[in-house]
Amino acid sequence: MLWQDKNSIVAPMSPALNNQDTIKTKLKYINTSFENASQLDWEIDSAGVINLGLIYDHERSSPNRANGHWYFQIQAEPGADLTLILKNFDNVWNGRKASPVSDSTNCLISEDGINWTAIPTDFITGNRLKFQVHMKGDKLYVASVEPYRLSDLEKLKTEISKNPLVEISTIGKTVEGRPLEIIRVGNPDAHYRVFIRARAHSWEPGGNWVVQGLIRGLLQKDGNSYLAG
């Protein structure tokens, strides 16, 4: 009820917030400030579910947009059981809607960012993925596929650079000035050549592991015969 004196009108004070309505969660933070992490928004609903909204990668001068890569770190109390929902998988490819997830999509978790374990997800209404995690420690990495980082690429180049069958050449630069490189494996005078592209998108790490494995396989002793012709 309002009351009034000669100089002012004063509204009644709002009732104090009910502490029972405060969301109780053992989550401390969703961290994305590290190499190859995917940017996202997140919030906790009234049931304590952590809702994560991936941010689309938009193609220049095109309606196309894509998501499919997620990589973040959960920081929470040890022993916590958390439920998470991932959304924003309404991709657009050549002007048509497409989705990178389904009822067969898995998720990967890791305590150290090196050793990964696959866990199931539930494909729920709204083209979303729902899954649960148990916090053995205070940090847990979550990803769509085992991430392939710039540091992984640098390690590979260092590993193979002195091999006489390898040549690493800079062929251009990215829009931010980073070098674009091509790795030749084999005899430069061979009659046949195969061109394989990797690292086209940061959110497509699976192909990077395949190409790295192919390079290592070809450079092994039993693989050299394929490089001679």
List PLM regions with ranges:
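M14 metallocarboxypeptidase catalytic domain recognition
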Residues: M1-G229
